[in-house]
Regions:
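Interaction-mediating elements
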Residues: 1-130
């Protein structure tokens, strides 16, 4: 029997989460604020998206943990990445977006960016004082 699973994350802000999802090539579904599951059941989410293989995924705010949780029906997960790897990629891009936004606010510029073989991203930043 299929049911919805919620997976805790450390993602605390909507804007960098949406930017991360978009940068990874995932389209946010602006009209739907729910995730469909087995036998047409659905659950409400704050951010909804469709992955390949008709996999439905959403992120829902959890007031207790002050973070978003991933919501999906794991029995219907047909995406090419395992759910753990998907969360890892989203978390990495979320951190990247957060760092870029904060450093630009503080007057830093990216001098160099390297995507390493191990999947990490190396940034070199500079700030010019007047």
């Amino acid at each position: 029997m299929s049911h919805f699973s919620t997976i805790k994350t450390q993602l605390k802000e909507a804007e960098p989460l949406i930017m991360a999802l978009n940068n990874l090539g995932y389209n946010i579904n602006q009209e739907e604020k729910f995730v469909k599951g087995y036998r047409g059941k659905f659950t409400a989410v704050d951010i909804s998206m469709n992955l390949a293989g008709d996999t439905k995924v959403g992120f829902k705010w959890n007031n207790n943990s002050n973070a978003y949780e991933l919501v999906t029906d794991l029995d219907l997960w047909k995406f090419e990445l395992p759910v753990e790897r998907f969360i890892s990629k989203v978390t990495q891009m979320y951190a990247y977006q957060t760092i870029i936004s904060k450093t630009q606010e503080d007057g830093y510029q990216i001098v160099e960016q390297k995507n390493k073989n191990d999947g990490s991203i190396e940034l070199v930043l500079t700030k010019w004082d007047n």
